Amino acid sequence: PGLKEEYDRLAVEMIRRRKEGNGFNFFHFMIDLEGGPCVAKRLSGCGSGTEYLAVTPWGDLYPCHQFVGNEKFLMGNVDDGIVNTEIRDEFKCCNVYAKEKCKKCFAKFYCSGGCAANSYNFHGNINDAYDVGCELQRKRIECAIMIKAAMAEMEEEQNEEK
């Protein structure tokens, strides 16, 4: 709850400073309401286990760096390639449509179901959604939209004055 309140305070401060001509950006509040996130990322997030792999210094392959060392997620090695295709297939199905909590969430196409590693570490399942991450992501999107609305209002007022 405290972090969400701080996001609100930051958004209000960003609006105030932009009105004064001294604006700044915060990556998590940067949102494109017209184009949105790239299409591929809307469904499956980062692409762990399917679009990229983590390679250890010993040549072991894991779906992402956060799974390195967890033998359950060892996919293979650079010499033999991917030998555990079940893990790859599990990550192929890791998307907003596989996560029950995402189905009715307004933010699903901005977070794409969140981080598989966080879901696994929190729930023991990559196809669940990491609740804390979801709550914070939704709040960041709300703040981003609030900033966009305030800036549009400010621009409209400036145009009326001309």
Where are these regions (language model features)?
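Flexible mid-to-C-terminal extensions adjoining Fe-S/redox cofactors in radical SAM and related proteins
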Residues: V68-K162
